[in-house]
Regions:
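S-adenosyl-L-methionine
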Residues: 16-63
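Helix-to-beta-strand junctions that scaffold the AdoMet/dcAdoMet cofactor pocket
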Residues: 95-97
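Mobile active-site "lid"/loop adjacent to the S-adenosyl-L-methionine
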Residues: 19, 42, 60-90
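C-terminal catalytic and target-recognition region of SAM-dependent MTase-like enzymes
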Residues: 99-155
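Short, well-ordered secondary-structure micro-motifs
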Residues: 50-53, 73-75, 114-115
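Conserved SAM-binding loop of SAM-dependent methyltransferases across substrates and taxa
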Residues: 1-11
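Conserved beta-strand segments of alpha/beta enzyme cores
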Residues: 10, 37-39, 128-130
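Active-site proximal loops enriched in glycine and acidic residues that flank catalytic Cys/His/Asp
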Residues: 15, 24, 42-44, 63-66, ...
C-alpha cells in the first residue's frame, strides 16, 4: 500500500484485523504518507470485494497478501487453501477493463511460485506472468532464508 501510495496511486487497504490496519496507518504516518489518498478498511476481503462489485467500483491494480489462516469478527474461519480461489474470482470482477497488474503473495507452505502463477493464469489469461520466492538475505550470512512466494501478472 505504501509503495503504491508513494508512487502516486489512490489506494484502498483492506485487512480483517483492526490492529494490522492501525499498524499500517502508523507506518504510513512514519513515512510521511498520512496525507496520501489511502482508504483504510477493516473488513473481510471477500465481503468487501462483494460490496465493491455491487457498487460498480473497479480497480486498475491489486496487491493481494492473504493470510494462511484467520478468524473474522463473527468467528468465520479463513483458510487460504479453501478461500483463495473465491477471493481471486472476486478480484477478477473488480479489476478494470484495462488492469495494470495483479500481485499475489503467500507465506503458506505448499503455495509455491508455480501454484500462484497457475492460479493467476487461470483467472486472468493473457498477460505477462512471473513468479518467485521471497528471500531474506543477511549481511553476515551467505545463506538466503525463504519467507514466502509471489506471482505477478501484468498486461
Amino acid at each position: 500500500t505504501l509503495a503504491a501510495a508513494q508512487g502516486g496511486a489512490r489506494c484502498c487497504h483492506v485487512d480483517a484485523s483492526k490492529g494490522m490496519v492501525a499498524w499500517a496507518r502508523e507506518n504510513a504516518k512514519l513515512n510521511g504518507l498520512e496525507d496520501h489518498p489511502i482508504r483504510w478498511i477493516v473488513d473481510d476481503v471477500n465481503k468487501f470485494l462483494t460490496r465493491e462489485i455491487k457498487r460498480g467500483r473497479r480497480y486498475d491494480a491489486i496487491l493481494l497478501d492473504p493470510p494462511s489462516f484467520g478468524r473474522g469478527k463473527g468467528g468465520e474461519l479463513y483458510k487460504i487453501e479453501h478461500a483463495l480461489l473465491e477471493t481471486l474470482q472476486l478480484v477478477r470482477k473488480v479489476m478494470s477493463d484495462q488492469p495494470s497488474f495483479l500481485y499475489l503473495t503467500s507465506h503458506t507452505p505448499g503455495f509455491t511460485p508455480i501454484v500462484l502463477k497457475n492460479l493467476i493464469q487461470e483467472l486472468l489469461g493473457e498477460g505477462q506472468l512471473d513468479s518467485g520466492e521471497m528471500l531474506l538475505t543477511g549481511k553476515e550470512s551467505a545463506l538466503d532464508v525463504p519467507s514466502g512466494t509471489w506471482a505477478r501478472w501484468k498486461k
